[in-house]
Amino acid sequence: MFPEQQKEEFVSVWVRDPRIQKEDFWHSYIDYEICIHTNSMCFTMKTSCVRRRYREFVWLRQRLQSNALLVQLPELPSKNLFFNMNNRQHVDQRRQGLEDFLRKVLQNALLLSDSSLHLFLQSHLNSEDIEACVSGQTKYSVEEAIHKFALMNRRFPEEDEEGKKENDIDYDSESSSSGLGHSSDDSSSHGCKVNTAPQES
């Protein structure tokens, strides 16, 4: 008998559906939906979506770099002083750059084991709460934060809508940043260790 053929693992990520969000009367920003589909043992739930803004990506890159000093991290799209959120070309160039960044990050096994990355991709927590959770300063664990968000957000976008939405921007949306349906990273039980130890600042 032949040994059972192992399935090749994959992690697919899309950054899509940019939306203008109102911060206050004078200030707005754009956030992007990050969707993941995977069969990787590092993830328990195989599909996830969350909304993040550019400055959260900047924080994530800094966080990952501080936790993996010897890893050469991919670059983010540069911060353009003349960035115009009403310019579709500007928005789509940034969206594509953010997607390329995440795709490269998710190909690195060391970065994929970082709890900060999992919480960024699979929870509603902001950067301060992610840092607190990873360093053990919250009542909930990394896994609990992700599972709670997964229970609150079960819907995942239809794949056949991806092509329509990927490059569209909703200029009238004032909805809050919320995810749709999330996966968890109970990866310690699958041999993919997630770093939850406190980090030195």
Curated annotation (Swiss-Prot):
Binding site for a 1,2-diacyl-sn-glycero-3-phospho-(1D-myo-inositol-3-phosphate): R53, K79, R94
Outcome reported for the amino acid change (mutating R53A): Abolishes vacuolization induced by overexpression
Occurrences of domain PX (ranges): 10-127
Region (Required for interaction with ATP6V1D): 8-125
Record annotation: effect of changing K79A: Slightly reduced vacuolization induced by overexpression
Gene3D superfamilies: Phox-like domain
Family indicated by similarity: Belongs to the sorting nexin family.
Free-text function comment from the UniProt entry: Probable phosphoinositide-binding protein involved in protein sorting and membrane trafficking in endosomes. Plays a role in cilium biogenesis through regulation of the transport and the localization of proteins to the cilium. Required for the localization to the cilium of V-ATPase subunit ATP6V1D and ATP6V0D1, and RAB8A. Involved in osteoclast differentiation and therefore bone resorption.
Record's protein name: Sorting nexin-10
Residues spanning the signal sequence: none
Written domain comment of the UniProt record: The PX domain mediates interaction with membranes enriched in phosphatidylinositol 3-phosphate.
Membrane topology: Peripheral membrane protein
Domain of life per record: Eukaryota
Principal location class: cytoplasm
Pfam families: PX (PF00787)
Database matches in SUPFAM superfamilies: PX domain
Key words, A-Z: Cilium biogenesis/degradation, Cytoplasm, Cytoskeleton, Disease variant, Endosome, Lipid-binding, Membrane, Osteopetrosis, Protein transport, Transport
